[in-house]
């Protein structure tokens, strides 16, 4: 029997693309967005169960027995080399469901499921099939990869990782061996003044300022704070620790050259940005873009927590691409101009005036969640360099489109999801990638080795796998040592991926490199040599929501001497106003002494005060929404220990397991259904049969609150009067509470002596 199984595994493995095999090898599982499940999965599970090793079974049983401390889960989450809790959860779910089905009506249940499946189930299946093909490259792409094998020399680390990096055009894009093209008329105005020359150019002022020891000691201590209100951005919080900085104001200048845009940006930007502009008005920026660029161009840090994936996403992407490319073009022009001066050896030339570089070449790091985002960024950068319809020379463009693009047929035509879901998961949603981009005058090189790149575009997990962990032999983070502009776009999505990767990245930014990497130290700025790069780095942070974890990045990892600007608009109504079903919402406040104890306090409050009210059979069809996966595991273990009648779904549950759990819950065969927030984020299914709803914690995304509540209307049989909704919150959930009920109500609830508050929605409907 063993000899017959081996070809099956090989056949199953051959059906995976190279990317899927690589992802499976590195992480031990497919991405939670995908549902690549074999049609004969149940049979395969039963056959493989006896083959499970004793160690694996023992670890699974231990994971199921007692709730483990939360801090231990965080330690496991931060370690890539060990087996994750998610893998144990998935294998445990499959084992339990397979045994359950084997004892009962195995095939009959499957037939019943298919016959009773709703239209949405059909959509979900096609959804999984369509997205499962997204990562697969066409045959032409694989052939192209084979033809470019010769170009991989010069980057051993990338070769070992199986990545393609272009080393063929190294000399063409080298800053050390190129000079300003003086014969070209377009290049005469491209030189950037030396930092010692008096100029109002924000770039020159920023990188040219030499801080003193006393200035460094002041940064972050007792900053001066001020509040501003701008028409588009709203309420701003401005802070700065150093005096003698230019006051922050909205730039009203319409002449792009006077905004210190480098060639060719002041001629290409109006055309590239035209889709967002009104035809009847002569303008180069939308009101939002103008205010954002005013802050970016002042080189202050920026936190914008109102980035909608639907309305403003592309506007913001365009304006930060403009700023990033403007910074790179100016920096490179300064280096090339100084190369020419050094070559000509003009009399009176001071070597100190030629300090124009960092310890490594990468200047801009753009972190985005999916390949589709990287694709759009590169397309914008290319468009911004195309002058007068003349195509820019882009190396490896074909390969880039094949690896980062997607086909229209990859998306199922009958997929119906909310607008924000369609915007977030458009195109190629692979979240493991990194790519270097080198820019020199009128040419661009994609897949440039990191130490020959100006811009690095990557996902958090893509960076984590190259940064590595302490103790690993093959790890590299020197390329992050001289990052001058850091852009974290769609930061809220990293909470749904793995926030530990973001923290790991921030901890390795602007550290002194372990190797010289061939740098000419006579050209390195003094503040880079003094290990002060983090005080010059500008951080642009964009998110669709305010969350303590995101706020901590801005507050604890940003040290820009120019100061910080944070948009601080409070929600007025909250997402509860979008609940259309007639439903009483009972908000119960739990007490906790500190942020460290709130997790245990919530569990104790739920098991002792809330759950006993729902144990009665009359309180069936109870859905428990759990934002944290660790809380989900803890509750699941507790429910099993108490032998409660429940089923559960998380982001790692396979499609057949999800279908069974939904059917059990809909028919009332299981009293409770535990659901994680990440499952709802990645799938956005409508779960039918809900009569009682419990939010174990307020949702990360406020609109998820109204979405889950409105699921009740999908299955109503005249029982609306008995529906209930219970929400647990603490004083540490102030931001999430304000996003759900509104800022004014949230303040009243947190200050009130009462611990229970009632809201009723849909009274007129």
Curated annotation (Swiss-Prot):
Biased composition (Acidic residues): 84-127, 147-163
Binding partners and assembly: Interacts with CAPN3; the interaction is required for CAPN3 translocation to the nucleolus.
Physiological role: Component of the ribosomal small subunit processome for the biogenesis of ribosomes, functions in pre-ribosomal RNA (pre-rRNA) processing. Essential for embryonic development in part through the regulation of p53 pathway. Controls the expansion growth of digestive organs and liver. Also involved in the sympathetic neuronal development. Mediates, with CAPN3, the proteasome-independent degradation of p53/TP53.
Pfam families: Utp25_C (PF06862), UTP25_NTPase-like (PF22916)
Span list, region Disordered: 1-170
Region of interest (Represses p53/TP53 degradation), residue spans: 644-705
Gene Ontology molecular function: U3 snoRNA binding
Organism: Xenopus tropicalis (Western clawed frog)
Protein's GO biological process: embryonic organ development; protein catabolic process; protein destabilization; protein localization to nucleolus; rRNA processing
Disulfide-bonded cysteines: none
Places the protein is found: Nucleus, Nucleolus
Gene: utp25
Comp. bias intervals (Basic and acidic residues): 128-146
Keywords per UniProt: Developmental protein, Nucleus, Phosphoprotein
Name of the molecule in the record: U3 small nucleolar RNA-associated protein 25 homolog
SUPFAM superfamilies: P-loop containing nucleoside triphosphate hydrolases (SSF52540)
Modified residues (Phosphoserine): 52, 61, 65
Sequence similarity: Belongs to the UTP25 family.
Record note on modification: Phosphorylated. Phosphorylation is required to promote p53/TP53 degradation in the nucleolus which promotes cell cycle progression and liver development.
GO cellular component terms listed in the entry, alphabetical order: nucleolus
């Amino acid at each position: 029997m063993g000899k017959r199984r081996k070809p099956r595994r090989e056949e199953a493995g051959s059906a995976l693309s190279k990317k899927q095999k690589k992802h499976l090898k590195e992480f031990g599982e497919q991405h939670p967005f995908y549902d690549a499940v074999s049609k004969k999965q149940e049979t395969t599970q039963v056959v493989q169960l006896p083959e499970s090793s004793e160690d694996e079974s023992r670890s699974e049983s231990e994971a199921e027995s007692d709730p483990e401390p939360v801090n231990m889960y965080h330690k496991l989450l931060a370690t890539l080399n060990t087996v994750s809790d998610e893998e144990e959860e998935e294998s445990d779910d499959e084992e339990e469901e397979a045994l359950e089905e084997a004892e009962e009506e195995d095939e009959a249940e499957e037939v019943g499921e298919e016959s009773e499946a709703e239209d949405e189930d059909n959509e979900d299946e096609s959804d999984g099939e369509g997205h499962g093909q997204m990562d697969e490259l066409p045959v032409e792409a694989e052939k192209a990869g084979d033809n470019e094998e010769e170009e991989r020399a010069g980057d051993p680390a990338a070769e070992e990782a199986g990545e393609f990096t272009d080393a063929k055009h190294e000399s063409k894009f080298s800053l050390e061996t190129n000079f300003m093209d003086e014969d070209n008329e377009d290049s005469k105005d491209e030189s950037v003044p030396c930092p010692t020359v008096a100029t109002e150019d924000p770039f020159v002022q920023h990188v040219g300022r030499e801080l003193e020891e006393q200035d460094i000691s002041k940064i972050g201590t007792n900053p001066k704070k001020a509040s501003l209100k701008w028409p588009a951005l709203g309420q701003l919080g401005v802070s700065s620790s150093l005096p003698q900085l230019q006051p922050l104001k909205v730039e009203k200048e319409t002449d792009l050259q006077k905004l210190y845009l480098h060639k060719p940006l002041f001629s290409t930007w109006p055309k590239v940005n035209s889709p967002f502009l009104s035809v009847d008005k002569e303008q180069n920026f939308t009101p939002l873009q103008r205010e954002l660029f005013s802050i970016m161009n002042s080189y202050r840090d920026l936190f914008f927590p109102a980035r909608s994936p639907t309305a403003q996403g592309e506007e913001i992407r365009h304006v930060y691409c403009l700023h990033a490319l403007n910074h790179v073009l100016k920096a490179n022009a300064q280096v090339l101009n100084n190369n020419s001066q050094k070559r000509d050896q003009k009399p009176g030339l001071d070597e100190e005036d030629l300090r124009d570089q960092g310890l490594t070449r990468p200047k801009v790091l753009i972190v985005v969640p999916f390949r589709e985002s990287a694709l759009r960024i590169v397309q914008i950068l290319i468009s911004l360099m195309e002058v007068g319809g003349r195509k820019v020379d882009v190396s490896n463009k074909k390969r880039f489109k094949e690896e980062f693009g997607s086909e229209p047929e990859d998306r199922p035509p009958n997929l119906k999801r909310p607008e924000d879901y369609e915007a977030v998961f458009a195109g190629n949603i692979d979240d493991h990638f990194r790519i270097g981009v080198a820019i020199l005058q009128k040419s661009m090189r994609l897949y440039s080795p990191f130490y020959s790149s100006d811009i690095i575009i990557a996902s958090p997990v893509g960076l984590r796998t190259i940064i590595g962990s302490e103790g690993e032999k093959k790890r590299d983070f020197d390329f992050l040592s001289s990052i001058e502009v850091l852009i974290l776009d769609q930061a809220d999505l990293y909470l749904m991926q793995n926030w530990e990767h973001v923290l790991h990245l921030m901890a390795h930014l602007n550290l002194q490199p372990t190797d010289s990497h061939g740098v000419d130290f006579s050209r390195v700025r003094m503040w880079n040599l003094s290990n002060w790069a983090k005080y010059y780095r500008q951080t642009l942070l964009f998110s669709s929501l305010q969350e303590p974890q995101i706020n901590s990045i801005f507050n604890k990892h940003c040290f820009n001497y120019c100061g910080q600007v944070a948009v601080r608009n409070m929600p007025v109504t909250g997402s509860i106003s979008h609940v259309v079903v007639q439903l009483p919402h009972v908000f119960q406040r739990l007490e906790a002494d500190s942020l460290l104890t709130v997790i245990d306090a919530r569990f104790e409050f739920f098991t002792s005060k809330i759950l006993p009210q729902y144990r009665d059979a009359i309180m069936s069809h109870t859905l428990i929404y759990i934002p944290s996966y660790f809380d989900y595991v803890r509750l699941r273990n507790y429910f099993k220990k108490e032998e409660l009648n429940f089923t559960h779904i998380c982001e790692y549950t396979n499609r057949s397991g999800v279908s069974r759990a939904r059917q059990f819950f809909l028919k009332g065969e299981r009293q409770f259904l535990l659901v994680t927030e990440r499952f709802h984020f990645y799938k956005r299914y409508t779960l039918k049969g809900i009569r009682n709803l419990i939010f174990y914690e307020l949702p990360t995304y406020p609109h998820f609150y109204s979405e889950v509540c409105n699921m009740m209307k999908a299955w109503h049989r005249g029982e609306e009067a008995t529906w209930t909704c219970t929400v647990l919150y603490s004083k540490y959930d102030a931001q999430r509470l304000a996003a759900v009920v509104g800022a004014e109500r949230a303040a009243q609830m947190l200050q009130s002596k009462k611990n229970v508050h009632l809201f009723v929605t849909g009274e007129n409907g």
